[in-house]
Amino acid sequence: MSKSASRARLADIIRNRSFGRGEITLASGRKSDFYFNLKPTMLDPEGAALLAELTYEALRDEQVDFIGGLEMGAVPLAGAIAQLSWLKNHPIAAFFVRKKPKEHGAKLAIEGLAKGESLAGKRCVIVEDVTTTGGSAIKAVEAVRESGAEIVLVLTMVDREEGATEAFAEAGLPFRSLYKASEFLNR
């Protein structure tokens, strides 16, 4: 399937499985009359494959070592992308950032790294399912930067177009999205 056909098919899947109308309170605390819940798309076999494919293609020239982000939205994405990158002979390892470090066991804030492995000096992409103001991704950026990694990009599947672009620009972070909310609202 061509990139444009993959993108169109994935938009259909998102529209049918993950987009809705109706009043909702977002993670940012804002109220909205539409929502994206990308979990049904990320956990659908075809949706997961297309998200991984399009994300992998978007990162192809970035020389990325790791991909991850804040739980829960980043977990299925990072895992699917890691698997596809291995199959494409260009491995990108995955991790995720806990919203709150575990209070037992290793008490880690960043999960997915082997014992003795570190993000220090690694080129990382922060990935997110849906971005409104960018607050969740910024939390992940802060944790990953604290570990010594370089953030090369913040990539979201759907940008709600409600301030994230400006917030990331202000923070000096490159930001891209696969889709914009207006692509779903204007149809």
Curated annotation (Swiss-Prot):
Pathway(s) annotated for this protein in UniProt: Pyrimidine metabolism; UMP biosynthesis via de novo pathway; UMP from orotate: step 1/2
Cofactor: Mg(2+)
Biological process, per Gene Ontology: 'de novo' UMP biosynthetic process; pyrimidine nucleobase biosynthetic process
The protein's Enzyme Commission number: 2.4.2.10
UniProt cross-references to Gene3D superfamilies, sorted A to Z: 3.40.50.2020
InterPro entries per record: OPRT, Or_phspho_trans_dom, PRibTrfase_dom, PRTase-like
One Pfam family in the UniProt entry: Pribosyltran
Reaction(s) the record says it catalyses: orotidine 5'-phosphate + diphosphate = orotate + 5-phospho-alpha-D-ribose 1-diphosphate
Top-tier EC class: transferase
Binding-site residues for orotate, renumbered to this chain: 132, 160
Entry keywords, A to Z: Glycosyltransferase, Magnesium, Pyrimidine biosynthesis, Transferase
Record's subunit section: Homodimer.
HAMAP family: PyrE
Primary role: Catalyzes the transfer of a ribosyl phosphate group from 5-phosphoribose 1-diphosphate to orotate, leading to the formation of orotidine monophosphate (OMP).
Family: Belongs to the purine/pyrimidine phosphoribosyltransferase family. PyrE subfamily.
NCBIfam families with a match to the protein in the record: pyrE
Protein name: Orotate phosphoribosyltransferase
